[in-house]
Design a protein with these regions (language model features):
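Hydrophobic alpha-helical transmembrane segments in multi-pass membrane proteins
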Residues: 11-28, 54-83, 105-128
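Membrane-interface extramembranous regions at the lipid-water interface
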Residues: 1-57, 130-151
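Membrane-interfacial helical/loop segments at transmembrane boundaries in membrane proteins
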Residues: 81-101
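Membrane-interface elements of multi-pass transporters and channels
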Residues: 37-41, 72, 76-87, 139
Length: 151
């Protein structure tokens, strides 16, 4: 049976990952601070701290993969329609018409990558809240789609 202090520390570990919306890298810094200060005193806090950090690191990896897919696709799609000689030799170059017919498959993959990224961020927010509620009730929580970097 976990004490109220352990439940609170574990809950704040989950909720501290929401600081990413206020501080850059807050979703890593604050959970690490809470987890390292309490992990030796409580196995419950240790478990939840590892879950939070593994989830955040997994989301970082997934986001980097999606960005690595989406950005080159959008760059290729946009620049394949621009005549570079016209840009170099004409000061008044205006793009009149984009023809995406040749790159529709690439553009679709890029849009899907951006949509999956958005879905990851929305689900991250709700999973953090759900994990905090479960943890405050004394239940162990394991995030879905998480790679166990820290064991």
């Amino acid at each position: 049976m976990e004490t109220i202090t352990e439940k609170n520390a574990a809950t704040f570990t989950h909720l501290s990952s929401l600081t990413q919306y206020f501080f850059p890298f807050g979703n890593y810094i604050f959970p690490i601070l809470i987890w390292t200060s309490k992990k030796d005193k409580s196995e419950f806090v240790d478990h939840n701290g590892k879950q939070v950090l593994n989830f955040q690191l997994s989301l970082l990896l997934y986001s980097l993969v999606l960005i690595a897919i989406a950005i080159p696709i959008f760059i290729i799609t946009i620049f394949s329609n621009i005549p570079f000689n016209a840009i170099i030799h004409d000061d008044n170059f205006v793009i009149n018409n984009f023809n995406f017919d040749n790159n529709m498959g690439l553009l679709t993959i890029g849009i899907i990558a951006v949509l999956i990224f958005g879905l990851l961020k929305v689900s991250e927010f709700f999973l953090i809240i759900y994990a905090a509620i479960k943890t405050s009730n004394g239940e162990r929580f394991k995030y879905p789609i998480t790679i166990p970097f820290i064991k």
